Every structure is written in C-alpha cells, then in structure tokens.
Amino acid sequence: SRRQRQICIRDRQVDTPQNLYQKPGNLFVAGFMGSPQMNFLDAVISEKGGNLIAKVGDHELAIPAAKAKALKDGGYVGKTVVLGIRPEDIHDSQMFIEASPSAPMTSVVKVYELLGAEVFLYFDVNGTQVTARVDPRTTAKTGDPIKFAFDMEKSHFFDKETELTICN
C-alpha cells in the first residue's frame, strides 16, 4: 500500500500500517492487520519466583520485564487475559527454542502449507488452533510432533473484557 496512514474507523485507531500491525490498540485491530492474523490464546497471569508468567493451559511462558510491569501495574496478576502472538513470532528452530527463557511447547502439526519462501504450520495449543510462519527448511510435516517457542518479546496482551491492549 502506498498510504502513509490507515484508519480503523470501528475502533478509532489512526496510525501508519506498520504501527497498526506492531502496536494494535485492541483485539479487533490486532486480528484485522496481518495475514494470517494474530493468534489469540487465553492466559492466566501469575507470579512465580518474583517474575510474572503467562499460563496457557499447562505451559508457563516467561513475560519480559516491561510487559510484566504493565500487567502488574494494571492489576492483571491472577486474572485471565488474551495473549496475542503473530505467526512469525512462533519458532520451531532448535536454536531459538534453546535460547528461550520458557520451556518449549509441544503439539502435533495438523496442516503443513508450503508457500515457497515460507511455511505455515497449523496446530493446537490448549485446544486453540495456532498458525506459525516458519522457515521453509523446517523438518515438520503434517502429523509430526513439533516443539516450538513463542518470542515473548513480541507478544501482545489484551484485556479479556474490554478487548483493549494492555501492552505490546
């Protein structure tokens, strides 16, 4: 698009396409911008060892300090929020998984979609379908178990009731 600014009239967010994508003001904008759209998972914010974690089912995801501060200051500890993660921020490379502060998550690939320079993997996390955009050199195929990790530095958190962004 050649436009410098886009307007999401429904939700009154006026910004550059890049900012709408990277810093959505609410769930609608987050889901509207990008293809495939952002993945949304319910997460309970908890404290563990002085740090905040997002619990998605049995998975505990370490929350980066700046996001943890916003969640804590907003009174979200002990509450369910919506965790948003873009498909390109889910990684199946061993190097990323080993460097992740959270334990790797596991699932089974339901669909493998090769698009040339990228691959989309579709699988479930805690009963919710998730889409990951990964390197085409991935060895994962339909039916394979997969280990993956979220890049929590690029995660988004939304208030479950108001659907407004808590932090990007």
Show which residues each predicted segment covers.
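Short, conserved beta-turn/loop elements at beta-strand boundaries and strand-helix junctions
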Residues: 47-51, 112-119, 160
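Glycine/charge-rich catalytic "coupling/switch" loops of P-loop NTPases
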Residues: 22, 51-108, 129, 139-168
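Single conserved hydrophobic/aromatic residue that forms the stacking wall/gate
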Residues: 1-11
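Structural detector for short beta-strands of small beta-barrel domains
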Residues: 36-48, 101-112
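ABC ATPase "signature
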Residues: 13-15, 23-26
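Short acidic-hydrophobic catalytic motif
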Residues: 18-22, 30-33
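A residue-level detector for short acidic-glycine micro-motifs
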Residues: 45-47, 89-92, 111-113, 136
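Residue-level detector of high-confidence beta-strand sites
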Residues: 13-14, 112, 168
